[in-house]
Amino acid sequence: AAQLFQKACDGGEALGCNGLGILYENGRGVRQDYQKAAQLYQKVCDGGGVSGCTGLGFLYSDNKRVGQDYQKAAQLFQKACDGGEALGCNSLGILYKYGQGVRQNFSTAKEYYGKACDLGLQLGCDNYRELNEKGY
């Protein structure tokens, strides 16, 4: 799979680059390399591929990977969410809920969870319901 993704990525296919990034992030068929995954996700994100923005956001929000930077993660999740990526919206909601990289705001978190839900992510619906039940 890595060779096929590499060939597609070299040919300018964003999905190939994103798939290769996933392989490097998880060490599947290639040696695990978070920096390489980050470079690939950045390439996808810069080219308008919102899944790359989400993948890179996860790398920045997890300090075991490329160095924790919640503000950078929030920017990436925002870009992904603006592009219609449900997981990006939900992840941005989480950052708002816990005040990571952004000022804590439960109403804003709920708004992003709702958008994730509207985009078809059940986890977003669950998170929205949880905050709704708490009165936010």
Regions found by a protein language model. Name each.
Residues Q104-Q122, R129:
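TPR/TPR-like (Sel1-like) alpha-helical repeat modules
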Residues D10, R28-Q32, D46, K64-Q68, ...:
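Short coil/turn and helix-start
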Residues A1-G16:
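Low-complexity/repetitive intrinsically disordered segments
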Residues D10-E13, A38, A74, Q78, ...:
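Periodic short-repeat tracts
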Residues G19-N26, C53-D62, S91-Y98, N127-K134:
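Hydrophobic face of amphipathic alpha-helices that form TPR/SEL1-like repeat modules
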